[in-house]
């Protein structure tokens, strides 16, 4: 029994110590995202490819492809650390990666839950 208990303790201590530090970002619904981006101090970031962005995007957003090897460097030279970032991708997978990278670098990040697909499904404004 003591071995079992020790094993459980070891498992949980390992689990909690392996969590990455510094990844603090918030998932927000399309409605919350719309409220956030109504604030002119919020930076709008589309992390999809240039082709996807060119097809259609949320008005006022800038595009930095998270799959670009230089994503972090481009973001640092383009974005302001003292202003929060509201970011999105197509469905949420790439934006999670971008949110993790940016939050580790000290940015305050909000990620659009369900991405651009969720945004469009709720009838929110887009531009081409």
Task: Provide a role label for each language-model segment.
Residues 44-46:
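Structural scaffold elements adjacent to functional motifs in cytosolic proteins
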Residues 2-5, 16-36, 42, 51-84, ...:
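Rhodanese-like catalytic fold shared by cysteine-dependent sulfurtransferases
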Residues 88:
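Short, surface-exposed ligand- or partner-binding patches at beta-edge/loop junctions that are enriched
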């Amino acid at each position: 029994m003591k071995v079992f208990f020790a094993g459980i303790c070891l498992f949980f201590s390992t689990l909690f110590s392996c969590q990455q530090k510094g990844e603090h970002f918030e998932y927000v619904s399309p409605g919350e995202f719309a409220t956030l981006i109504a604030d002119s101090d919020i930076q709008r970031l589309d992390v999809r490819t240039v082709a996807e962005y060119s097809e259609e995007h949320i008005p006022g957003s800038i595009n930095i492809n998270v799959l670009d090897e230089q994503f972090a460097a481009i973001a640092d030279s383009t974005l302001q650390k003292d202003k929060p970032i509201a970011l999105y991708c197509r469905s949420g997978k790439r934006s999670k990666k971008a949110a993790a990278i940016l939050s580790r670098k000290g940015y305050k990040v909000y990620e659009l839950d369900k991405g651009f697909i969720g945004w469009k499904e709720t009838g929110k404004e887009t531009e081409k």
